[in-house]
Amino acid sequence: MLILTRRIGETLIIGDDVNITVLGVKGNQVRLGINAPKDVSVHREEIYLRIQQEKESDDSEQAV
């Protein structure tokens, strides 16, 4: 895992198309701004896991 330190207003770039900017820090929360192409999905981890569970559930129902 790559670990980076950024300050408010600083940006990191992933590949050629994804920019992540630190917008603010309040206590233990960090606000991030993410610019990515429309074909790149961006989700919080808990939402992504829920989507994956729903896909697995749909796949298992179709297999029956």
Swiss-Prot record:
Keywords: Activator, Cytoplasm, Repressor, RNA-binding, Translation regulation. One of its GO terms (cellular component) is cytosol. GO terms for molecular function: mRNA 5'-UTR binding. One of its GO terms (biological process) is regulation of carbohydrate metabolic process. It is found in: Cytoplasm. Pfam families: CsrA. Homodimer; the beta-strands of each monomer intercalate to form a hydrophobic core, while the alpha-helices form wings that extend away from the core. Belongs to the CsrA/RsmA family. A key translational regulator that binds mRNA to regulate translation initiation and/or mRNA stability. Mediates global changes in gene expression, shifting from rapid growth to stress survival by linking envelope stress, the stringent response and the catabolite repression systems. Usually binds in the 5'-UTR; binding at or near the Shine-Dalgarno sequence prevents ribosome-binding, repressing translation, binding elsewhere in the 5'-UTR can activate translation and/or stabilize the mRNA. Its function is antagonized by small RNA(s). This is Translational regulator CsrA. It comes from Legionella pneumophila (strain Corby).
